[in-house]
A protein has these predicted regions:
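Juxtamembrane regions of bacterial inner-membrane/periplasmic proteins
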Residues: 1-217
Length: 217
């Protein structure tokens, strides 16, 4: 994947989200920690692809084809997810997975880990037409991401894994349960203290949703 300039690739990664695009420093630390902990704990260690996880995902893809069931989950790093979300379709084929790997490796050569995480958090889908953490924060809580507390931030970070299943407007309890699981992961990884975990775990999440842009799985 070759672009004429670094600027042109960044434009592609930002897409039409500039109005709600946050720089790395503007993204709350709780959001960055939650995304890494739940989506790709080795994000700052690998070079774009976790080949062991990818191999397991490939086996699951084969099984899903043979059984005609959707059982293929996971295996993609944050960089791979970014490659798929921005440059590829959601089809589950071997060809797409190979392209995803090569694009991810290319992204890792061109950008720092912090830049990739910034692109990812600004591009990931949060259900109900909201792309990126700023749009999600304004859409679900009617406030900018910088004003999210820990529980609210992690609640939002629970959605992208399966946007339809964790859609908080339709499956609030699913989102809440995942929020609590992610908080425990953050505690185990020393991202938060025991007191912060306890407070966020028991905090009541009150949504103040704006009108959704559109519904999309």
């Amino acid at each position: 994947l070759i672009y004429a300039s670094n600027k042109s690739m960044i434009a592609k990664l930002k897409g039409d989200k500039d109005s709600y695009y946050l720089s790395f420093d503007e993204i709350p630390q709780s959001v960055k920690d939650a995304m890494v902990v739940t989506e790709d704990r080795d994000f700052y260690k690998h070079e774009g692809v976790n080949f062991w996880s990818t191999a397991k995902a490939a086996v699951m893809l084969v099984e899903s084809k043979l059984r005609h069931k959707d059982i293929s989950r996971g295996g993609s790093t944050i960089t791979q997810q970014l490659a798929k979300n921005v440059f590829l379709s959601n089809e589950r084929t071997y060809e797409r997975k190979v392209r995803e790997i090569f694009i991810a490796l290319d992204l890792e050569k061109k950008y720092t880990k912090d830049q990739i995480l910034e692109f990812y958090i600004n591009n990931i889908y949060f259900a109900n037409g909201y792309y990126g953490i700023e749009a999600a924060s304004r859409g679900y809580f009617n406030k900018p991401a910088k004003d999210l507390d820990l529980a609210e931030a992690v609640f939002l970070c629970s959605i992208p894994n399966r946007p339809s299943f964790y859609n908080p407007l339709e499956h609030y309890q699913n989102t809440l349960k995942r929020k609590n699981r992610i908080l425990k992961q953050m505690l185990d990884e020393d991202c938060i203290s025991a007191a912060e975990y306890s407070d966020a775990n028991y905090e009541k999440i009150v949504l103040k949703p704006a009108q959704a842009i559109k519904t999309q799985n």
